[in-house]
Amino acid sequence: MYSVTTAGGSVPVIDDLDAAIIGLLHAEPRIGVLEASRRLNVARGTVQARLDRLHARGVVTGYGPDVDPETIGFGVTAFVTLEIRQVGGHDPVTERLALIPEILEVHTITGAGDMLCRVVARTNADLQRVIDAIVTAEGVARASTVIALATPVRYRVLPLVRAAARPRSGAGHSPA
């Protein structure tokens, strides 16, 4: 991995070895560095150095299990757009929303609303309870909710990682 300087500053760039390491870890999160180096046909130290850099730069942020909310009883997914009172800003609202376990993500957005939340619930009636908890959070002025009927493309980053990878420099060698 290396950096490219743009008008916005230095942007980390990954190469095809970084992408291969990330892809392997995505497919087999419990694989060890030694086994990864064998499968990728590179030195163990190279894989470890690349992983250390990917972690240090925030490209790889963890190895936790991916949990499908539906498999633990939360079969309803909805997106809630919030308009907030501008007096206190986003931070106090975000802190309150973070206390609601059914909120999986909160994004500040442009457009008609100020924040977008991805939430889950057990049933539609339970979704009403979650929405009630959201709209009673101090600073929330209005909420608009849409329920997801299906998720034909789940959250994924591996295609993006592959698209972002640049070919390694040199004849089969890359900087560790």
What does each model-found stretch correspond to?
Residues 1-176:
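A compositional/biophysical signature of low hydrophobicity enriched in polar/charged and small residues
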